[in-house]
Amino acid sequence: IRHITAWDDDDRLINKSYSVKKGLLADPNFRAGFAELEKLNLSFDAWLYHPQIDDLTDLAQNFPGTTIILDHCGGPLGLGEYARASTNVFASWKKSIEKLAACRNVRVKLGGLGMRINGYDFHEKHLPPTSDELAKAWFPYFDTCIQAFGPDRCMFESNFPVDKGSY
């Protein structure tokens, strides 16, 4: 089961194609539905933004029997206020990832960092990024996830064609 919970105060970061509300992961009605997943032996894919990772950690701690898969490395944001605080964004994201990784029922998908919301300026360049440019840009995130979760709880993902939007 995948549910998009990606929400932020900045309206520019909200995808108008779907309805998302603040604090959804803590909502009692959401959690009542979430409780059914373990009974059905279903996993949960979480697509959210990095400021919401701590909410996902709380969910994982309260439902240790449900496998949770964090999509897109936890959605580190790089637009708006987050662009101006990129060093703080990485530090905050990393701290939250390490805390989430302590929950043994959580896995992480490595990918999805090519979206414009991640703040890379690839779409402003004349040519698409090279493999080396992508590897250099994404390495800190992939490395942190692999170190925190271990290789047994990491998986690669494709986010095509959405990632192509940034280049």
Question: Where in this protein do the model-derived segments appear?
Answer:
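Weak global preference for isoleucine
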Residues: 1-4, 14, 53, 68-69, ...
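Active-site gating/metal-coordination segments in enzymes
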Residues: 1-52, 58-61, 74, 88-89, ...
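H/E-rich (His + Asp/Glu) clusters that bind or coordinate divalent metals
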Residues: 79-167
